[in-house]
């Protein structure tokens, strides 16, 4: 016996409504971050090697990412309730310019091992105990940072980058990998990617959107 068309439509509508009600999206920003730093060899004991004015003097109006300079950031995930499945995670990064003109690449990798107070080019932390990176600048593959990049993003102009980080968020949320945040790098020696500073015009612009649903 055939089901009436109206009955089928009602069933489909109820299914769609059920799915939309169960799935939720939260948004975190840099204002929620527990740890953040920009490190580089030009100021090996500083955690804010962001925009060089000249002669080893830096300020925090921009983040100028070059081959030797790295951006570290960690978001807490405790706003995701227990018993969920992460279905989508997108990280938004505000880029203001690239130089020279053309296509550049931004690399995002998971950090390995705890880092914190006093983090800089030489050390992952200086308190409560002084711990050096395995290689300066958190460069140690599989010891300081993941060998494989979580994302490689092509950048050719300013604007918002929308980066799929679903796999990393799922790994951190389930506890399969400890959440130590990301290290963001540029590997081409000729590239400059300038990012808005979370301490200046970019405050609140580093958004992490996570969609999850009950398992």
Label the model's feature ranges.
Residues 82-86, 170-180:
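Short glycine/proline/serine/threonine-rich loop/turn segments at secondary-structure transition edges
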Residues 21-79, 116, 188-189, 199-215:
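Flexible, small-residue-rich N-terminal segments that precede or flank a structured functional core
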Residues 184-193:
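Short beta-strand-plus-loop segments that form exposed binding edges in beta-rich domains
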Residues 7-16:
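Bacterial N-terminal signal peptides
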Residues 1-4:
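Positively charged n-region of N-terminal signal peptides that target proteins for export
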Residues 75, 85-97, 208:
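A short beta-strand element within beta-rich, extracytoplasmic domains
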Residues 98-171:
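Beta-strand-rich interaction/scaffold domains
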Residues 93-95, 186, 212:
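Short beta-strand segments enriched in hydrophobic/aromatic residues
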């Amino acid at each position: 016996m055939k089901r009436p068309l109206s009955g089928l439509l009602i069933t489909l509508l109820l299914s769609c409504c059920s799915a939309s009600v169960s799935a939720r999206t939260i948004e975190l920003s840099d204002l929620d971050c527990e740890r953040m730093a920009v490190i580089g060899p030009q100021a090996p004991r500083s955690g804010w090697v962001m925009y060089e004015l000249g002669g080893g003097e830096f300020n925090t109006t921009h983040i100028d990412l070059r081959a030797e300079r790295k951006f570290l950031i960690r978001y807490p995930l405790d706003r995701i309730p227990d018993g969920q499945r992460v279905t989508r995670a997108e990280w938004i990064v505000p880029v203001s310019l690239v130089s020279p003109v053309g296509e550049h690449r931004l690399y995002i990798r998971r950090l390995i091992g705890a880092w914190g107070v006093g983090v800089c080019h030489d050390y992952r932390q200086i308190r409560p105990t002084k711990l050096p990176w395995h290689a300066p600048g958190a460069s140690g593959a599989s010891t300081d940072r993941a060998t494989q990049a979580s994302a490689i993003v092509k950048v050719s102009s300013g604007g918002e980058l929308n980066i799929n980080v679903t796999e990393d968020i799922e790994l951190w949320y389930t506890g399969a990998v400890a959440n130590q945040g990301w290290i963001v790098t540029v590997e081409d020696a000729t590239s400059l990617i300038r990012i808005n500073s979370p301490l200046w015009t970019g405050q609140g612009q580093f958004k992490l959107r996570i969609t999850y649903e009950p398992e």
